[in-house]
Amino acid sequence: MTTEYLLRREMEHVLAALTPSNRLVCRVCLQTGLRVGDVVSLKTRDLKGQFWIVEAKTKKRRRVNLPRELLGQIRAQAGEVWAFPGRRPGRHRTRQAVWADVKRAARAFRIKQNVAPHSFRKVY
Protein backbone atom coordinates (compact mmCIF):
# COMPACT_ATOMS: atom_id res chain seq x y z
CA MET A 1 0.00 0.00 0.00
CA THR A 2 1.45 3.37 -0.94
CA THR A 3 1.38 6.46 1.22
CA GLU A 4 -0.31 9.55 -0.08
CA TYR A 5 0.40 13.25 -0.10
CA LEU A 6 -1.19 15.28 2.65
CA LEU A 7 -2.61 18.76 2.43
CA ARG A 8 -0.61 21.25 4.48
CA ARG A 9 -3.51 21.62 6.94
CA GLU A 10 -3.73 17.83 7.39
CA MET A 11 0.01 17.57 7.89
CA GLU A 12 -0.10 20.25 10.59
CA HIS A 13 -2.94 18.42 12.37
CA VAL A 14 -1.06 15.12 12.34
CA LEU A 15 2.18 16.74 13.53
CA ALA A 16 0.36 18.50 16.37
CA ALA A 17 -1.17 15.22 17.57
CA LEU A 18 2.13 13.29 17.70
CA THR A 19 4.17 12.79 20.85
CA PRO A 20 6.93 15.45 21.02
CA SER A 21 9.75 13.05 20.15
CA ASN A 22 7.86 11.46 17.23
CA ARG A 23 6.87 14.94 16.01
CA LEU A 24 10.57 15.79 15.94
CA VAL A 25 11.37 12.64 13.93
CA CYS A 26 8.68 13.55 11.38
CA ARG A 27 9.88 17.15 11.19
CA VAL A 28 13.38 15.86 10.34
CA CYS A 29 11.84 13.70 7.58
CA LEU A 30 9.94 16.76 6.36
CA GLN A 31 12.99 19.06 6.37
CA THR A 32 15.58 16.62 5.00
CA GLY A 33 13.75 14.01 2.92
CA LEU A 34 15.34 11.21 4.96
CA ARG A 35 13.50 7.97 5.57
CA VAL A 36 12.21 7.44 9.09
CA GLY A 37 14.60 4.50 9.64
CA ASP A 38 17.57 6.71 8.78
CA VAL A 39 16.34 9.46 11.11
CA VAL A 40 15.77 7.27 14.18
CA SER A 41 19.19 5.66 13.74
CA LEU A 42 21.08 8.98 13.85
CA LYS A 43 23.75 9.03 16.52
CA THR A 44 24.19 11.96 18.88
CA ARG A 45 27.84 12.36 17.85
CA ASP A 46 26.72 12.92 14.23
CA LEU A 47 24.46 15.86 15.06
CA LYS A 48 25.92 18.81 13.23
CA GLY A 49 24.27 21.41 11.03
CA GLN A 50 25.57 19.53 8.01
CA PHE A 51 26.64 15.90 7.93
CA TRP A 52 26.93 12.90 5.63
CA ILE A 53 24.72 9.83 5.90
CA VAL A 54 24.65 6.50 4.10
CA GLU A 55 20.99 5.73 3.49
CA ALA A 56 20.10 2.28 4.82
CA LYS A 57 17.81 1.32 1.94
CA THR A 58 19.79 2.56 -1.06
CA LYS A 59 23.31 2.57 0.43
CA LYS A 60 23.77 5.98 -1.21
CA ARG A 61 25.85 8.58 0.56
CA ARG A 62 24.28 12.01 0.82
CA ARG A 63 24.80 15.27 2.62
CA VAL A 64 22.10 16.37 5.04
CA ASN A 65 21.50 19.93 6.19
CA LEU A 66 19.62 20.42 9.45
CA PRO A 67 18.22 23.86 10.29
CA ARG A 68 19.65 25.28 13.55
CA GLU A 69 16.27 25.34 15.29
CA LEU A 70 15.66 21.67 14.53
CA LEU A 71 19.22 20.73 15.49
CA GLY A 72 18.79 22.42 18.88
CA GLN A 73 15.54 20.58 19.53
CA ILE A 74 17.10 17.24 18.64
CA ARG A 75 20.11 17.86 20.88
CA ALA A 76 17.82 18.85 23.77
CA GLN A 77 16.14 15.43 23.80
CA ALA A 78 19.02 13.29 22.48
CA GLY A 79 20.45 10.45 24.50
CA GLU A 80 24.08 9.68 25.14
CA VAL A 81 24.39 7.50 22.02
CA TRP A 82 21.22 7.90 19.96
CA ALA A 83 19.69 11.17 18.79
CA PHE A 84 16.27 9.54 19.24
CA PRO A 85 16.59 7.10 22.16
CA GLY A 86 14.06 4.32 22.49
CA ARG A 87 12.28 2.88 25.49
CA ARG A 88 14.79 0.06 25.83
CA PRO A 89 18.13 1.17 27.28
CA GLY A 90 20.89 1.41 24.70
CA ARG A 91 18.48 1.24 21.74
CA HIS A 92 17.19 3.90 19.38
CA ARG A 93 13.51 4.62 18.78
CA THR A 94 12.00 2.22 16.28
CA ARG A 95 10.47 3.24 12.99
CA GLN A 96 7.47 1.11 13.94
CA ALA A 97 6.86 3.25 17.05
CA VAL A 98 6.85 6.40 14.91
CA TRP A 99 4.60 4.69 12.33
CA ALA A 100 2.06 3.68 15.00
CA ASP A 101 1.94 7.21 16.42
CA VAL A 102 1.43 8.75 12.95
CA LYS A 103 -1.40 6.27 12.24
CA ARG A 104 -3.03 7.10 15.59
CA ALA A 105 -2.78 10.85 14.92
CA ALA A 106 -4.26 10.50 11.41
CA ARG A 107 -7.18 8.46 12.76
CA ALA A 108 -7.81 11.09 15.44
CA PHE A 109 -8.37 13.66 12.69
CA ARG A 110 -10.30 11.22 10.49
CA ILE A 111 -7.84 11.59 7.64
CA LYS A 112 -8.84 9.08 4.97
CA GLN A 113 -5.53 8.83 3.08
CA ASN A 114 -2.93 6.23 3.92
CA VAL A 115 -0.72 8.35 6.16
CA ALA A 116 2.66 7.14 7.42
CA PRO A 117 6.01 8.76 8.26
CA HIS A 118 6.88 8.41 4.56
CA SER A 119 4.14 10.98 3.84
CA PHE A 120 6.37 13.64 5.44
CA ARG A 121 9.32 12.61 3.31
CA LYS A 122 7.24 13.03 0.16
CA VAL A 123 6.76 16.73 0.90
CA TYR A 124 10.52 17.32 0.84
Predicted regions and their residues:
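Short, basic (Lys/Arg/His-rich) helix/loop patches that form interaction surfaces
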Residues: 16, 100-123
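Basic, Lys/Arg-rich DNA-contacting stretches centered on the C-terminal catalytic core
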Residues: 1-2, 9, 17-18, 49-71
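Basic, Lys/Arg- and aromatic-enriched nucleic-acid-binding interface segment
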Residues: 4-36
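Flexible interdomain linker/hinge and immediately adjacent N-terminus
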Residues: 1-11, 85-91
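Short, charged phosphate-coordinating catalytic segments
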Residues: 29-49
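C-terminal catalytic core of Y-nucleophile DNA break-rejoin enzymes
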Residues: 56-75, 81-103
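Short, leucine-enriched amphipathic alpha-helices that occur as contiguous helical runs
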Residues: 11, 22-23, 95, 99, ...
